[in-house]
């Protein structure tokens, strides 16, 4: 459930990843644009399977660059959270950040190496090494949830128990004053900026 910000503007928090579903219902396709008519023919089925496999392979290879960037953003945000919580210099925190960075670099290296070891197919397409591509994709997919967990851990659980934004601005019963007082963990950071980081 998305709650619109009422006091602290955060335009980037309103941007999300969008996937699409394309439905061809009662759609005319000119015959010269039909490439796989005759599914009962053995060669067509084999070609269709290979086409799907190569499409997935290309996607997995692109993943080694895409998810690396996501991991770098998570590492940066986790480092910011650690600074706001005044724990950035703790060895266990540095270890956690190093784990995220290490995974990102290994995934990127797998993608680069798979491109370096690519083969040119008769069609002219340069196809990345399958083993290295799959290794990078698996490493990224396996560790991304650990990275989210690390970031949540570094917040000290505040990301799960942060009061609604309105509470930080309530005047009755000093609710806002108390929320702003107890959210601060590092005296170098204001209550508002701490709130912004934790809400991010």
Where are these regions (language model features)?
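FAD-binding core of flavoproteins
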Residues: 1-66
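Short, well-ordered loop/turn and helix-capping segments at boundaries between secondary-structure elements
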Residues: 29-30, 103, 146, 153
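Extended amphipathic alpha-helical segments enriched in small hydrophobics
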Residues: 62-121
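Short, charged, amphipathic alpha-helical segments
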Residues: 94-98, 126-134
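Active/binding-pocket-proximal capping segment
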Residues: 114-124, 161, 165-169
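Alpha-helix capping/hinge segments and adjacent helical runs
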Residues: 131-200
């Amino acid at each position: 459930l998305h709650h619109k910000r009422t006091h602290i503007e955060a335009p980037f928090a309103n941007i999300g990843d969008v996937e699409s579903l394309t439905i061809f219902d009662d759609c005319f396709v000119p015959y010269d644009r039909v490439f796989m008519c005759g599914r009962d023919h053995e060669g067509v089925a084999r070609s269709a399977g290979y086409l799907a496999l190569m499409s997935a392979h290309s996607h997995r290879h692109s993943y080694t660059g895409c998810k690396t960037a996501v991991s770098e953003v998570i590492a940066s945000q986790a480092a910011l959270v650690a600074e706001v919580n005044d724990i950035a210099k703790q060895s266990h925190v540095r270890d956690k950040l190093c784990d995220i960075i290490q995974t990102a670099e290994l995934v990127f290296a797998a993608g680069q190496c798979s491109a370096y070891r690519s083969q040119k197919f008769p069609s002219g397409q340069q196809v990345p090494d399958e083993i290295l591509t799959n290794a990078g994709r698996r490493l990224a997919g396996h560790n991304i949830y650990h990275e989210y967990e690390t970031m949540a851990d570094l917040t000290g659980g505040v990301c799960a128990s942060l009061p609604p934004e309105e509470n930080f601005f309530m005047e009755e019963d000093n609710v806002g004053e108390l929320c702003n007082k107890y959210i601060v963990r590092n005296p170098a950071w204001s209550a508002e900026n701490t709130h912004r980081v934790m809400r991010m």
